[in-house]
Amino acid sequence: MLHYSNCNKICEKTVMNQRTIKTAIAVTGTGLHSGQPVDLEFQPQPIDTGIVFERSDIVGSTPIPASAFLVQDTMMSSNLVFGGTRVGTVEHLLSAIAGLGVDNLLIRVSASEIPIMDGSAAPFVGLLLQAGLCEQDALKKFIRIVRTVRVKVDDKWAELRPYSGFELNFEIDFDHPAIDKDFQHAQLQFSTQNFIEQLSSARTFGFLRDIEAMRQNNLALGGSMDNAIVIDEANILNEEGLRFNDEFVRHKILDALGDLYLIGYPILGRFNAYKSGHALNNLLVREILSDHNNFEIVTFDDNVTCPIEYLPLNGITVEG
């Protein structure tokens, strides 16, 4: 479990520098679509490296930067392709990385997809914290939205607006008896603590009829109620039920946070979305980056002037 220090906020003035992990760490999970074991390893990286993926099962494979422009497939997940090499289902892991404020990291994976773990970002958060976070000798860079950008497809839309911090608002619209109409909108005022407590453990979800159809096409072979909320025509099938009343929409925010981190920096802006998904999230990021008048890259000399609250490196520990 995660344990917070008594100080809920950054209490002392400290430099707002880039972060990586202290030491390499590895885990094995299950591929959502293959159903096969997948080895995952995180390694520290130098300043200004960014987040980079590498296929450990392919000798001499080309490293894949975590870039919105390398997303070539958004069917049910965000998938990166570079130099003919693919790494899929990256959004939950990227959400954890964004939530902890990690700037530089090498992710080595032994298959074409990141393991699904429990269907949320929480296992990745725990793993990164076990490795330990450390600050580096360079200021952390942020992308500040200076002009509202909106993308729309049919009735679905997503936008980023200028805002002093980072806020995410999301609304879904499911006409299903198991998805309460009163819990289809959620908001997150981003901070590391809010991310861990309110968002990181929200699981992905799927409808039983869709899962059965995918399995007929050799997809979702690793999917189960251990790593997803499964819904039939009327009910949630997981015996333990939901972790939050609004877990469905919280997970959509979790996905969006990971998709948005493909912009390359932590965001200063307000994200609003209605029925958005991986494709629209990616389109939004590309649209923002297409015009330098939409944004500016900024740094902060200290955490007091930085409008985003990251917990200090000693503010979270892993127990058990």
UniProtKB/Swiss-Prot annotation:
InterPro entries from the entry?
Answer: Ribosomal_Su5_D2-typ_SF, UDP-acyl_GlcNac_deAcase, UDP-acyl_GlcNac_deAcase_C, UDP-acyl_N-AcGlcN_deAcase_N
List the active-site residues: 278 (proton donor)
Enzyme Commission number(s) from the entry: 3.5.1.108
Q: Which Pfam families match?
A: LpxC
Give the range the annotation lists for the signal sequence. none
The cofactors required by this protein are:
Zn(2+)
Q: What reaction does this catalyse? A: a UDP-3-O-[(3R)-3-hydroxyacyl]-N-acetyl-alpha-D-glucosamine + H2O = a UDP-3-O-[(3R)-3-hydroxyacyl]-alpha-D-glucosamine + acetate
UniProt keyword list:
Hydrolase, Lipid A biosynthesis, Lipid biosynthesis, Lipid metabolism, Metal-binding, Zinc
User: What pathway or pathways are given for this protein in its record?
Assistant: Glycolipid biosynthesis; lipid IV(A) biosynthesis; lipid IV(A) from (3R)-3-hydroxytetradecanoyl-[acyl-carrier-protein] and UDP-N-acetyl-alpha-D-glucosamine: step 2/6
Q: Does the keyword Electron transport apply?
A: no
What GO molecular function annotations does the UniProt record carry, in alphabetical order?
A: metal ion binding; UDP-3-O-acyl-N-acetylglucosamine deacetylase activity
Residues recorded as binding Zn(2+), renumbered to this chain, are 92, 251, 255
Alphabetical GO biological process terms: lipid A biosynthetic process
GO CC term (a single one):
membrane
If you read the UniProt record, what top EC class would you report for this enzyme, in one word?
Answer: hydrolase
| Protein role | Catalyzes the hydrolysis of UDP-3-O-myristoyl-N-acetylglucosamine to form UDP-3-O-myristoylglucosamine and acetate, the committed step in lipid A biosynthesis.
What is stated as this protein's family in its record?
Belongs to the LpxC family.
Q: What is this protein called?
A: UDP-3-O-acyl-N-acetylglucosamine deacetylase
> Whose protein is this, by species?
Psychrobacter arcticus (strain DSM 17307 / VKM B-2377 / 273-4)
Query: From which lineage does this chain's organism come?
Result: Bacteria, Pseudomonadati, Pseudomonadota, Gammaproteobacteria, Moraxellales
